[in-house]
Amino acid sequence: AEGLNREQYVYLANVSEQAERYEEMVEFMQKVVVGSTPASELTVEERNLLSVAYKNVIGSLRAAWRIVSSIEQKEEGRKNDDHVSLVKHYRSKVENELTQVCATILSLLDSNLVPSASASESKVFYLKMKGDYHRYLAEFKVGDERKTATEDTMLSYKAAQDIASADLPPTHPIRLGLALNFSVFYYEILNQSDKACAMAKQAFEEAIAELDTLGEESYKDSTLIMQLLRDNLTLWTSDVQDQLDEP
């Protein structure tokens, strides 16, 4: 599929999404991004296709990593050294793929997407995405690499949050999605459950207060994310209770 035009790549990305061939979907959308000039920003449809493509590829790798890691822990518990070294080696293979996928999308974001984003909505979208992929690195990296990934996540989410708070309504699905992921970062990566809860709660309450401003088109997206924020809050506050209740 070389030398096609933008519309053709977008069409093939749609086809590959329906066929659930997400690696190819990523490749088609990379072509769209690299072929677009700063003057021709991605449309909302193209932006979403890019996001879905990478989210699926990284999603299956993250799931694989979690499974392999839990097998590794079990084998360590059993003191089975041969199996431990095999599964460690296999885990590092999955980690190399994770690193590679994150590197390619982060490079597209830094070189093309973030610099050419003009509207606040797209700036927040891409900065959030940048935070997400640094966070996925922070999930499995250790030592200095983890520290760097964590700092980069914080900077990206913070930059996105500054723009979102100033320019997007509290009910905007991208602003809500940012609050959701930023709060998960506080909870899972930084282990700051109080900060995570405060952020999720604030985003939820600010959106509830302005529910009447919700447009027809984003109603479903926004209420879905609000539900997720609330689910996390319920989960996290019960976790905090557990910690407090433990003798």
Swiss-Prot record:
InterPro entries: 14-3-3, 14-3-3_CS, 14-3-3_dom_sf, 14-3-3_domain. GO terms for biological process: protein localization; signal transduction. One of its GO terms (cellular component) is cytoplasm. Gene3D superfamilies: 14-3-3 domain. It holds the Pfam family 14-3-3. Belongs to the 14-3-3 family. PANTHER family: 14-3-3 PROTEIN (PTHR18860). This is 14-3-3-like protein B. It comes from Glycine max (Soybean). The gene is GF14B.
